[in-house]
């Protein structure tokens, strides 16, 4: 069951590159967002790769770091499924795990997050994360 929303952010895709073409193509994407996690403002920087599946959906996995404005950090890893949308937009749904030694963010070590990640046709990103109870 979904619990409370624990995070949200908006930002921009910062790079894209093809990292494989066989047996199917794989694209690596990086992004930066100004986020709020557990009510704490900071920056989220992430990179994910995605490849098409036979049915046309996307399989993706990624990793990144959330840094509070005072320098405390938490890393994350995620996996998800996505779909291409008109104009090159992409929509993903998936789950996240976290790791941190930062006192402010320690609760993340006990959380599995469920996310929505949207990238519009111009590269603007939007993320929402809920606690999975």
Q: Whereabouts are the PLM-identified features?
A:
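Beta-strand-enriched cores of mature, soluble protein domains
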Residues: 1-133
């Amino acid at each position: 069951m979904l619990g409370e929303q624990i995070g949200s952010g908006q930002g921009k895709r910062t790079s894209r590159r093809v990292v494989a073409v066989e047996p199917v193509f794989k694209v690596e994407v990086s992004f930066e967002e100004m986020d709020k996690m557990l009510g704490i403002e900071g920056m989220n920087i992430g990179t994910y790769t995605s490849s098409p599946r036979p049915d046309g959906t996307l399989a993706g996995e990624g990793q990144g770091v959330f840094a509070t404005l005072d320098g405390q950090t938490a890393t994350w890893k995620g996996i998800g499924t996505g779909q291409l949308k008109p104009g090159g937009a992409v929509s993903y749904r998936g789950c996240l795990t976290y790791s941190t030694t930062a006192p402010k963010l320690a609760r993340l070590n006990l959380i599995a997050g469920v996310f929505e990640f949207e990238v519009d046709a111009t590269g603007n990103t939007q993320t929402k994360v809920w606690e999975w109870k």
